[in-house]
Amino acid sequence: MYVRVNAYILEGTNHLNPIASNSVKLNVKPYYIELKDAVPTMWYLVGNMFGAKWANDKNIGVDALPMFLKPNFSYDKKTGAGEIEYTNYFLTGDYNDKAECDGAGFKILPSDFNWDYSMNAILNNEISAKKGTIENRNGGADGGHIVASEAGYYTITINTADNTAKMEKYEGNVTNYGTIQIATSLDDFASDTPMLPYNTEGVENHAWYYVMEVPAGQTVSFKFKIAGSWDTNWGYGAADGAINMYGKCEANGHNIGLAEGKYVISFNDITGAFSIVKL
């Protein structure tokens, strides 16, 4: 490719004293960048409802638990914005004079763990908050702990495009499995490994998580199941080993694949949703 520079003095519409440089030959090497969809935006549950873990170390899967990507939701390919959710049993309790609630209180943090933009309960005044409410702090004054209006099953939904949130009662049927296991191809599905519960306050739990590290150069498959039996198990995908980062599991579905890396895998035994966050 050849290029040159043309210059002139502009006077009104006239081009005065035009001059052109010598031509210069350039060798151009095409450069290809594969465009990838943005990773969906995630928020993290912290607080007394979740073992009094407040993300002090900003350690996902340890002191901050991911919400769930929504099955069949089309996330914005450029920004990753969309809806995320979390369904489980929630305790309730009374606020202290700091709008905090022991045992049942919690907050929700954005992926950068910036408390100035956390999800909190709406304050009535400096010492009390409105149960069952959620709003984004949006850089303003701190809000209260989020607390269910009464004990029971709820779904929390966050729209990460406009950072709005709601907490609604869940009215569907619920089966209590007690524990949920994960089985993997690392030992040819021979053993069960207990997943960890989101709820740690001695109440029913239906959301589970497990931190998995897939060795370099390998792909691992896994399924969710009840303890000691394959009579009840869940999988997902078009074929065994297909890699999917979220979806709604099917009974006796396909093995879910994961490429090398470290992940937090979450599963909800009420909704069947699974969601994976790469660390």
Language model features with spans:
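Insoluble glucan recognition modules
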Residues: 1-279
